[in-house]
Amino acid sequence: MSPTIRHVGFIGLGRMGAAIARNIMKAGFTLTVYNRTTAKMQPLVDAGAAGAASPAEAAAGADVVVTSLMDDQSVLDAVDGGSGVLRELRPGAVHVGTTTISPRCARTLAALHAAHGSEYVAAPVVGRPDVAEAGQLISFVAGEAGAIARCQAVVSAYSRAAIPVGATPAVANSLKLAVNYMLSAVVDLIGQVFAFGEKSGIEPQHLDMVIQTMFNHPGLQEYAARMRERRFDDVGFDLLGGLKDVQLILDASTEACAPLPFASVVRDKALTAVAHGLGAKDVSVVYEMTRMNAGLR
């Protein structure tokens, strides 16, 4: 454990957040947790964490506060709302943001913390909830060097790799959006190949074998298996979250004046799947739209 960091506040206990929080506890840190749905706090409270009634209460006395939330607005509300983190966070404390947010939101958070006298470190994560549970996430970390050093032991508690990407927090979020775009594009392409294979007489297990051999990435292999089996109810990351992420990269690419032509294709297919009532299923359910477009049922 870090010689200076003892107390961690944690806000957001969804599938990812709860897994990250458990690993922080396992690393020996004192943990105070907050979640809007209070029932989600109970398993961690039963395991020894303190429960808080607001983000501000979770931040009170904390050396590091970690947020794992849904989107820009939920993070801004938790940080700067009426009962937000900044109401109680002490000067010099560090806010570690794991949420996939826009670069614009990251710049806003950095400015809010600078005005408050605290530090913001962007540390968005790559990996599904099962990877988070195993403490094997990849974190892209950006912020002031001293702040990164102070929160390093906390980030390491749930990450197999914490990759430093500079002093500007928004850069870490831009990198996360780029990685999400790449993965979502590849997942969609794999789905297209499965649909082509089904109509061309290729056995799904043979295609799956090729994919497992050629793409040595556990996340892509998992998505390929889900599509082959059409297994979308055991949700790791839901389609609504995936739609949010691809919209973020489209917005960021517009701001940067860097066209990403395939991103709009991925977004529209995800949006079509949501319109068909599939938003709460695993993000790989976009494969069902590919099958539909190919005339498969």
Give the ranges of each region predicted by the language model.
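NAD(P)+-binding Rossmann beta1-loop-alpha1 motif at the extreme N-terminus of oxidoreductases
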Residues: 1-68, 93, 98, 129, ...
